[in-house]
Design a protein with these regions (language model features):
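A short hydrophobic beta-strand segment most commonly corresponding to one strand
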Residues: 111-115, 125-137
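Short, ordered coil/turn segments that flank beta-strands lining enzyme active or ligand-binding pockets
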Residues: 23-24, 97
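A short glycine-rich, His/Asp/Glu-containing loop-to-beta-strand
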Residues: 24-76, 130-137
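A short beta-strand-loop-beta hairpin characteristic of the jelly-roll/cupin
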Residues: 73, 78, 84-105
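Short acidic-glycine-tyrosine-enriched beta hairpin
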Residues: 35-36, 97-115
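Short acidic, Pro/Gly- and aromatic-enriched capping/linker segments at domain boundaries
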Residues: 2-22
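Short, Lys/Arg- and Gly-enriched loop/turn segments at beta-strand edges
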Residues: 41, 102, 118-124
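Histidine-centered metal-chelating micro-motifs
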Residues: 71-74, 93, 109-110, 115-121
């Protein structure tokens, strides 16, 4: 099973994702969250199956595909729910109240949980539409 990691001294793969959160004063910030992965037998019924590096599973409540038109520009707003956003095509630019701005293109992943406070700005960047998947948790 995926959740049954092999006994290894330390994870073999590390990555991170940006988290967008609201501090107690209502301002928003980015924080890079580390993710550790360990090898698991992902296909246990397949003899000789290669190991796959996997992080701990997280429960999710909804998965939604969305399309942002070229020129989409949402002024300051809190996130509608705690969710990961995966950019499939196009690009997104997020700005938080401390002034930091980050851009995400195809393959980009970030987590928003600023469901209270001043929120963030979201813009579709580039000349075409932006396709995203949101995964609520």
């Amino acid at each position: 099973m995926i959740d049954q990691c092999l006994d290894v001294a330390e994870p073999v793969m590390r990555t991170s994702y940006p988290r967008l959160y609201a501090s107690v004063d209502g301002d928003t910030h980015f924080q890079d969250v580390p993710v550790s992965m360990a090898p698991v037998v992902y296909l246990p019924d397949m003899p000789g199956a290669p190991l796959v590096d996997v992080a701990t599973s997280q429960s999710v409540t909804a998965l939604t595909f969305s399309r942002l038109e070229a020129g989409f520009d949402a002024d300051w707003h809190p996130a509608p729910r705690r969710q990961f956003v995966l950019v499939l095509s196009g690009g997104i630019e997020l700005t938080v109240t401390d002034g930091e701005m980050r851009s995400f293109g195809p393959g980009g992943v970030y987590f928003v949980e600023d469901t209270t406070g001043k929120g963030h700005r979201t813009r579709a960047v580039g000349t075409g539409e932006c396709l995203v998947v949101t995964v609520a948790c």
